[in-house]
UniProtKB/Swiss-Prot annotation:
Name of this chain's protein: 1-deoxy-D-xylulose-5-phosphate synthase
Gene from which the chain derives: dxs
Record-level Gene Ontology MF annotations: 1-deoxy-D-xylulose-5-phosphate synthase activity; magnesium ion binding; thiamine pyrophosphate binding
Pathway connected to this protein: Metabolic intermediate biosynthesis; 1-deoxy-D-xylulose 5-phosphate biosynthesis; 1-deoxy-D-xylulose 5-phosphate from D-glyceraldehyde 3-phosphate and pyruvate: step 1/1
Endpoints of the signal sequence: none
GO CC entries: cytosol
SMART domains tied to this protein: Transket_pyr
Family annotation (SUPFAM superfamilies): Thiamin diphosphate-binding fold (THDP-binding), TK C-terminal domain-like
Pfam families, per the entry: DXP_synthase_N (PF13292), Transket_pyr (PF02779), Transketolase_C (PF02780)
Length: 634
């Protein structure tokens, strides 16, 4: 099994194969990807769709000297397997294992780290210009999906690249008619019209004939090809940017891919190759439902993904989706917005029930935020469902277009804190710090499912921009209450009180997901625990009261410490006369790698044992055991 694949330890081995061996290799590679992902979980559909393209690129180009930048990067498993990491696939996305995305520190073939979309053309152009300035003669290649082409950054890069006539730059549009959710917007309709038109179908066949018979392209041949293409193919959007447009060609046909890429190698200036692929190619279940098989957990390939037979705790994403539908039922002004994450953000049901109030704006976070601001000026109640890591991409819009004008936009921030297998690129580590410094913002962090629901309701009642952050995955098991209750603005609550005497009294000020482990730590230490709920406005009265009645304060958050929620507590404490020693716990000042979420929290010292250990080391190393029966406040 995998007889050919076992002989490939790097692309040099691949380039020694006879062309006739490449399709059998592709079949083995596709089977290996399916087998590997079924055992570890990970991105599947996108990787099954890039097998032949990956083989062709490494076969034709002299990687790693020629640079390949994979946009988003979740389609790079075939690339990793062909570049010396075949055996590492058994550790994919696991702690101390290989990443699910390209990483420069992992391999010289990973020329640029990616995970967020639409960055590849900018990076590849920088490489192409840098190589030219250094006197190096190499190609720089950006592989970008049709979904990622909805982002403005891709067009900013193309606008710049189009005037770089002597850059050896190739942009490959991997057109699979999918991003994660189906792509949306005028650009995708434009591509669909071009590809489905009768005139274009005939033109495409003519261009493919030209490409298939062309010898290595000399300048004259290139001019003849462009002249012939100009006679039969309508001018495209990409040619208007200054690119030489080639395609579309079948991205699963090595006999089309390889000669075309070999011809492109002889050209200078920005080239644009349009390849058509199918997500899930070669695995019928993934072909039929590429969204379901986009990022599955472990499963049996022979049976496919089966519904869980054990009742699962409700996820925070589900809590949000249910709340949004309930809120829209009660108020016709509620509008839902997602930047191309319908399924991931829990908006499938909302789209079905309220299609006229559902807006998927594509991978366009900047536009999503300002679009929401515009809706708010007309008296609507926009809710932007967005991952914490992607909100970073719209920071100027958040400040300039929403907060500065004090517009009532609700930000439902999913994937706050660590996200497990997706690693540092997707961690929501910074939102508390970058949100709390913005004037007019209200910021809440949910500690359980029902609190999340009520916080979202509270956010919708505010006359200013308001954010509610919540984590990935299942909640704590707390049932949600159908009736809505508005949470008092800027007020936390004490969940447990210490019985320790003066000199040993510890108060833990916990935010969001850190309330539960803080209660566990408090049981071991007999400490007070406050569920702070609001990061902004911080409950200054509660902070100051705890400072007056306790000897030590501890702040705990699943976010960066510098500038985060703990800093807000320190600032509030310093305004009072009662200044106490403070221990601020949170994510470390480094990027946290991928792995099991519980293990990562433990390594960061943010589980119950870790919190208790840090408190003992800082404040109690000189004291006797202070544990006593717990006294929690209902």
């Amino acid at each position: 099994m995998y007889d050919l694949l076992k002989t490939i330890d790097d692309p040099a081995d691949l380039r020694r194969l006879d062309r006739r061996q490449l399709q059998p290799l592709a079949d083995e590679l596709r089977a290996f990807v399916l087998d590997s992902v079924s055992k570890t979980g990970g991105h599947l559909s996108s990787n099954l769709g890039t097998v032949e393209l990956t083989i062709a690129l490494h076969y034709v180009f002299n990687t790693p000297d020629d640079r390949i930048v994979w946009d988003v990067g979740h389609q790079t498993y075939p690339h990793k397997i062909l570049t010396g990491r075949r055996d590492g696939m058994k550790t994919l996305r696991q702690f101390d294992g290989i990443s699910g995305f390209p990483r420069r520190s992992e391999s010289e073939y990973d020329t640029f780290g990616t995970a967020h979309s639409s960055t590849s053309i900018s990076a590849a152009l920088g490489m192409a210009i840098g190589s030219k300035l250094n006197g190096d003669d190499r190609f720089s290649i950006a592989v970008i999906g049709d979904g990622a082409m909805t982002a403005g950054m891709a067009f900013e890069a193309m606008n710049n690249a189009g005037v770089s006539e002597d850059a050896k730059l190739l942009v490959i549009l991997n057109d699979n008619d999918m991003s994660i959710s189906p792509p949306v917007g005028a650009l995708n309709r434009h591509l669909a019209r071009l590809m489905s038109g009768r005139f274009y179908a005939a033109a495409r066949a003519g261009v493919e004939r030209v490409l298939s018979v062309a010898p290595p392209v000399l300048e004259l041949a290139r001019k003849l090809e462009e002249h012939a293409k100009g006679m039969v193919v309508p001018a495209t959007l990409f040619e208007e940017f200054g690119f030489n447009y080639i395609g579309p060609i079948d991205g699963h046909d090595l006999d089309s891919l390889i000669p075309t890429l070999q011809n492109i190698k002889e050209l200078r200036g920005p080239q644009f190759l349009h390849v058509v692929t199918k997500k899930g190619q070669g695995y019928k279940l993934a072909e039929a439902d590429p969204v379901l098989y986009h990022g599955p957990g472990k499963f049996n390939p022979a049976e496919g993904i089966k519904p869980s037979t054990t009742p699962a705790k409700k996820t925070y994403t589900q809590v949000f989706g249910e709340w949004l539908c309930d809120a829209a039922e009660l108020d016709a002004r509620v509008v839902g917005i997602t930047p191309a994450m319908r399924e991931g953000s829990g908006m499938v049901e909302f789209e079905k029930r309220f299609p006229e109030r559902y807006y998927d704006v594509g991978i366009a976070e900047q536009h999503a935020v300002t679009f929401a601001g515009g809706l708010a000026t007309e008296g609507l109640k926009p809710v932007v469902a967005i991952y914490s890591t992607f909100l970073q991409r719209a920071y100027d819009q958040l400040i300039h277009d929403v907060a500065l004008q004090n517009l009532p936009v609700v930000f439902a921030i999913d994937r706050a804190g660590l996200v497990g297998a997706d690693g540092a690129t997707h961690a929501g580590a910074y939102d508390l710090a970058f949100l709390r410094c913005i004037p007019n913002m209200t910021v809440m962090a949910a500690s359980d499912e029902n609190e999340c629901r009520q916080m979202l309701h509270t956010a919708l009642q505010q006359p200013n921009p308001t954010a509610v952050r919540y984590p990935r995955g299942a909640g704590t098991g707390v049932a949600t209450v159908k009736a809505f209750t508005e949470i008092p603005l800027g007020k936390g609550e004490v969940r447990r009180r210490t019985s320790q005497p003066d000199g040993k009294r510890i108060a833990i000020l916990a935010f969001g997901t850190m309330v539960a482990p803080s209660l566990a730590a408090a049981d071991a230490l007999d400490a007070t625990v406050a569920n702070m709920r609001f990061v902004k406005p911080i409950d200054a009265e509660l902070v100051q009261a705890l400072a007056r009645t306790h000897d030590y304060l501890v702040t705990v958050e699943e976010g960066c410490v510098m500038g985060g929620a703990g800093s807000a507590c320190v600032e509030a404490m310093m305004e009072s006369g009662a200044v106490r020693p403070v221990l601020q716990l949170g994510l470390p000042d480094r990027f946290v790698d991928h792995g099991d979420p519980a293990k990562l929290l433990s390594l960061c010292g943010l589980d119950g044992d870790g919190i208790a250990k840090s408190i003992r080391e800082r404040f109690l190393s000189h004291a006797a055991d202070v544990a006593s029966p717990a006294k929690r406040v209902a």
